[in-house]
Amino acid sequence: MSKLVIVESPAKAKNIKGYLGKGYDVVASMGHVRDLPAARLSVDIAHDFAPKYAVIAGKENFVKDLKKKAQAADYVYLATDPDREGEAISWHLATLLGLDMNEKNRVTFNEITKHGVLTGMEHPRAIDIDFVNAQQARRILDRLIGYKLSPFISQKIRRGLSAGRVQSVALRLVVDREEEIRAFKPEEYWSIDAKFTNPPERKSFAAALAGKVDDKAKIKITSKEESDKILSDLEGAEYIVQSVKKGTRKKSPTPPFITSTLQQEASRRLSFQAKRTMKAAQELYEGVEVAGHGTLGLITYMRTDSLRISEEARAAGNAFITETYGEKYLPKKPRYFKSKSNIQDGHEAIRPTTPSITPEMVKGSVTTDQYKIYKLVWERFIASLMENCLQETMKIEIVANGYVFNATGYTVKFDGFTVLYEEKGDDGKTEGAAPLPPVKAGDKLRLKSILGNQHFTQPPARYTDCLLYKSPSPREGAT
């Protein structure tokens, strides 16, 4: 019995063919085979916005050959990517090939490994027409907005300008932010910053003026004159530790990546634009040759909003953590992350397909971009399974001539997941530890320096790739 399997890319076709073996002909569609013709609107507005599709120019011979292959095969499987676009491509292929839409010939692979491919082939289903319609709605909106607004913008503003369903909204965000920046009026403020030692300790630590002893409100200094007045009040003052408060806090790991968070973190850490990130991720998903392991997909499908991971993947990750770091780095109860309630949960978060294959093991087999993205995905996934970081916090309150200074810091008591990975902020920096020296109430401190520092309030930052991806996607929590 001959079986035809249609996927999207040649690399994916080659790898899947290797897992399926004889009896399967695996061909690549090279993406979409039908689309709305560019020469006209191709949407019948008067008849419920019906789209008018045509075979993409240059693919006529491919479609002709594909029809012959489908007619000769005993069964046809549609194995395009597991997202809206992939579902739509399968629907277009089924339409062109005359396949029964109710037949279970649609298969999806969350990962391009032998296990992932064979599991997908064991669970065929009918084409999800709701998923197809979601893609069609987006495509029709793209066409309506682009074709209706672009000529107007080109005529009224500048020749060659265009509008789009996504780009116009993004442009609005950028313009609104720019208007905020232009309207912003900076306000002057000052801080009083000091450095102390606690003899015989030589290492100094920093503290900032917080307020007055008899006034719990935070002090606000708006001019150099006010700053100089406070510095004058503190001349010759004795600095005494009034209180030392200690506590503990737990720092939890962030979830494994979804599409938007992968793009954000790659932008922060690697200065990658989204296109570059997704290109490398697509290649890692479709499969690469890894020395000692053959050809395999290194990560799961990279277009996802789900934070779910399979129990098999969790077990494999836990085994790696136990073997590499020890059992104390595994939490007593497994950690589960909650996805947003309105997402498609058909596949998992972005994770390594084989957690035991470390980034260093693939470094010599993949491109630089592929290595960097795999390292991000692998570290984030493994860290998400690990124990919390435990920190001891300390707050020192120092009094002098009626003024109060505060110093805060922490020491790491157990590094937990941070032994492997820490998420960076929008400035590309991780939180730095600032341990404080041992002090107790009543200790007299030695002043090393004290300065008044001028500052100005800052306007909102202009959008970077990272901030633009982040704006519509609030972070999800864990349980």
Features from the language model and the residues they span:
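Conserved small/polar residues in nucleotide/adenosyl-binding loops
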Residues: Y469-A478
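Toprim catalytic domain recognition across nucleic-acid enzymes
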Residues: M1-L467
